[in-house]
């Protein structure tokens, strides 16, 4: 059965990861701006929603004998209403909350990664710059003064960052998405071996996927979405470094420097493991979603 993604112009424009959504998560499905009942009939409709889920739209889609897959984005705090979930055939959403994915909803809910920003990728792994030839040991470009960040991670990261010295290139911004343009940001990330990924409003950040796509090794604290087999743990443990606290970052970066001095290939090997894992993961999540949609 044919699948078509639909969303209003505002949401499609605001979804920074739209290429990833269309081509990785939903296997290249067509996208329609808005709802066209004369076109969308007797097929699988993937309804992308960033804000309030429209029960009226779901009803209209049902009248045309469509199967409805809700792709629910943007619920960073897990507080949005899920009342309309039961009126869909399948729900796919990002931002992992165990109470949502382990609860007995009236419909199956599958987690999907946010993915990388459009323009970051897709990157062919054979053309990714080796870690050993990158300019900076690590870098962070983004908003540090986010008082709403999960468990105060941005504040904790900002406090310890100066202790990293020359091992961390830091470019702080004054707000969300107020930094360098996507081209310069990509170049800078591709010039960095590691990318610390402190949580934003939610533990899951787009930065982590930007880093993976660019062959930049993420550094994170431990979070459910990284560990759970229903999320990034789908194909086994993530191969990138997981710290207990951002206070460990200066020591970690220093230890890497010492390790590389005695084992020059260490960085390239770690990078290769991350690239291979991310490549396999994209295939696995695409297959999981496609197979589930085919059974509707």
Residue ranges and their predicted role:
Residues 1-236, 242, 277-293:
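Nucleotide-sugar donor-binding catalytic core of glycosyltransferases
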Residues 180, 244-247, 262:
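Short coil/turn linker and secondary-structure boundary residues
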Residues 186, 246-249, 274:
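Catalytic phosphate/metal-binding cores of nucleic-acid and nucleotide-processing enzymes, i.e., regions
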Residues 254-296:
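A charged, aromatic-enriched C-terminal amphipathic alpha-helix characteristic of glycosyltransferases
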